[in-house]
């Protein structure tokens, strides 16, 4: 079977030597640019075409830079234990790709988000490319595959969690449930804390009936 051009593009992106040499130079240039930058063409053509991108009028490509890490929460002035400060260990309740889509939609309010994909990351930022469509353009209105964007029910769809990134963060993807979402991680961590408290509370009882020496006795 003959492999398509997009197969070789994907192999190029998976090549570590290529990522160290060429992509590193691009990251240095991208960091100097604004956080939301309009670009002429998609960087990963195979991913863009898989999400519905077409090289025609009405399509706009935007590269968004999102800061990595947890939330930058203010440190309280009143005294308390460091673990109760509520500063560290808190991350955003949304995925970074969803945040990038919302920022692009606020930058271009006359466009609708069709999809997005991951591009690259460095020690401080993550970079995503968002596919945006001008639903009022005559070329888009006459396209049978894209004219659904002009319906009023699809306005501001990114802010209602209707994109792929939004559905993933909400745990609505098929045969996935909450697996891999932020909600599942917090539920798992909460369950671990409850088991740990229960374990520490019964430690003295377990040591007393096991015949082992109880610390401090």
Curated annotation (Swiss-Prot):
Bias type Basic residues, positions: 171-200
GO biological process: cytoplasmic translation
GO CC terms of this entry: cytosolic large ribosomal subunit
Top-level taxonomic group: Archaea
Record region (Disordered): 165-202
GO molecular function: RNA binding; structural constituent of ribosome
One Pfam assignment: Ribosomal_L15e
SMART domains with a match to the protein in the record: Ribosomal_L15e
PROSITE patterns documented for this protein: RIBOSOMAL_L15E (PS01194)
InterPro entries: Rbsml_eL15_core_dom_sf, Ribosomal_eL15, Ribosomal_eL15_arc, Ribosomal_eL15_CS, Ribosomal_uL23/eL15/eS24_sf
SUPFAM superfamilies: Ribosomal proteins S24e, L23 and L15e
Record key words, sorted: Ribonucleoprotein, Ribosomal protein
Similarity section: Belongs to the eukaryotic ribosomal protein eL15 family.
NCBIfam families: PRK04243.1
PANTHER family on file: LARGE RIBOSOMAL SUBUNIT PROTEIN EL15, RIBOSOMAL PROTEIN L15
Protein name: Large ribosomal subunit protein eL15
Biological source species: Sulfolobus acidocaldarius (strain ATCC 33909 / DSM 639 / JCM 8929 / NBRC 15157 / NCIMB 11770)
Gene this chain is encoded by: rpl15e
């Amino acid at each position: 079977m003959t492999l398509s051009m997009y197969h070789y593009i994907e192999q190029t992106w998976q090549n570590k030597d290529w990522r160290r040499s060429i992509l590193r130079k691009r990251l240095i240039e991208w960091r100097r640019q604004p956080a939301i930058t309009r670009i002429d063409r998609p960087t990963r053509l195979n991913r863009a075409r898989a999400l519905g991108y077409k090289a025609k009028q009405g399509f706009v490509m935007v590269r968004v830079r999102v800061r990595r890490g947890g939330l930058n929460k203010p440190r309280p002035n009143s005294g308390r234990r460091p673990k109760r400060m509520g500063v560290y260990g808190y991350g955003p309740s949304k995925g970074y790709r969803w945040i990038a889509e919302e920022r692009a939609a606020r930058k271009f309010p006359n466009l609708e988000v069709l999809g997005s994909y991951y591009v690259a990351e460095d020690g401080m930022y993550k970079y995503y490319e968002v596919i945006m469509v001008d639903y009022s353009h005559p070329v888009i209105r006459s396209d049978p595959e894209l004219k659904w964007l002009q319906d009023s029910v699809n306005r501001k769809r990114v802010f209602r969690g209707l994109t792929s990134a939004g559905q993933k963060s909400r745990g609505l993807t098929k045969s996935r449930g909450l697996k891999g979402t932020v909600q599942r991680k917090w539920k798992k961590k909460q369950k671990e804390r409850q088991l740990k408290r229960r374990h520490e509370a019964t430690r003295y009882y377990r040591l007393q009936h096991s015949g082992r020496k109880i610390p401090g006795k």
